[in-house]
């Protein structure tokens, strides 16, 4: 008798995910004087989650949505919110919640996806997973600032204060859905005179990812900011592979080496013409020095061009 065994995906319902978030918020310690609050920390945070779920562009738009009685009932039933806070209270309360207390939620979701076999469709090159990292800003002002703000001064002397995060997400080409991991704040901290930066946040994020997912075979994907020796060394220490953009202006020695190898016909090349008469050009070479340092990492280089009517319409060196 023959048997065929299949790994069946276990469905994840919105209700089960919402329950996990709600329970986590209920267990968070409230930093406020509970005798003087009108809205529980749970209701404030769940309302914030609802705003993101409905994809409202602002707190004001979210509040306008809740002017409708049906929408209020949806918030209470779908998100288990008893008392709906006003926008100013939502802002004041959430601003004081440390992001670190929310990070376990990301790990919990990830493990649910693992147990339900949902991550298997994200595998690339056998059993690797591609994690893309990129920074984004979520607050900026020329007047309002705090001790954690990043300070940026323009050429004309205008000072701008910002808050940024470095976000990591598991993704795969062709898949519309991405799976976010816990982000890392880019912010100034007490006791450090030097301003925080994206690359330092990136190093912290790598350690966080490896600590949470120590068995996962990972490929980190990032822009040209990360294709420098200190970050690549950190990747290797974490046992991670990488695909990083390498701009010619940032890697003069690397480009000189590639140019010399190209003259010696040591660079592999493949050209493919598609049905639209566009020419796809691929070039690659393995095991070349990243820079001129004695302890330089040795890397692989790949470049792609798209040409149409003899003109390059797209290129990307990695």
Segments predicted by a language model, with ranges:
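Short alpha-helical patches at protein termini and domain edges
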Residues: 49, 99-103, 217
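Short, conserved catalytic/metal-binding motifs centered on acidic residues
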Residues: 47, 62, 86, 90, ...
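Domain-level cores of phosphate- or acyl-group-handling catalytic modules
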Residues: 192-253
């Amino acid at each position: 008798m023959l048997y065929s065994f299949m790994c069946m995906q276990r469905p994840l319902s919105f209700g089960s995910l919402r329950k996990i978030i709600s329970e986590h918020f209920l267990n968070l310690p409230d930093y406020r004087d509970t005798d003087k609050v009108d809205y529980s920390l749970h209701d404030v945070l769940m309302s914030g989650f609802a705003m993101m779920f409905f994809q409202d562009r602002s707190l004001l738009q979210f509040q306008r949505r809740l002017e409708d009685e049906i929408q209020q009932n949806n918030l209470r039933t779908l998100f288990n919110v008893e008392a709906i806070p006003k926008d100013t209270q939502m802002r004041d309360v959430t601003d004081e919640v440390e992001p670190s207390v929310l990070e376990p939620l990301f790990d919990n979701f990830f493990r649910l996806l693992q147990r339900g076999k949902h991550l298997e469709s994200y595998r690339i090159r056998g059993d690797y997973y591609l994690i893309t990292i990129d920074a984004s800003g979520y607050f900026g002002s020329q007047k309002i600032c705090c001790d954690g703000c990043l300070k940026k001064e323009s050429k004309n002397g205008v000072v701008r204060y910002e808050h940024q995060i470095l976000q990591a997400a598991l993704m795969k080409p062709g898949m519309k859905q991405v799976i976010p991991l816990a982000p890392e704040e880019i912010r100034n901290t007490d006791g450090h005179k030097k301003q925080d930066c994206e690359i330092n946040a990136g190093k912290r994020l790598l350690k966080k990812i490896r600590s949470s997912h120590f068995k996962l075979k990972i490929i980190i994907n990032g822009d040209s900011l990360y294709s420098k020796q200190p970050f690549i060394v950190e990747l290797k220490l974490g046992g991670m592979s990488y695909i990083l953009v390498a701009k010619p202006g940032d890697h003069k020695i690397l480009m000189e080496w590639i140019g010399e190898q190209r003259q010696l016909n040591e660079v592999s090349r493949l050209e493919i013409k598609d049905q639209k008469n566009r020419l796809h050009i691929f070039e690659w070479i393995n095991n070349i020095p990243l820079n001129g340092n004695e302890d330089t990492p040795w890397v692989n280089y790949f470049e792609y061009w798209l040409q149409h009517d003899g003109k390059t319409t797209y290129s990307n060196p990695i």
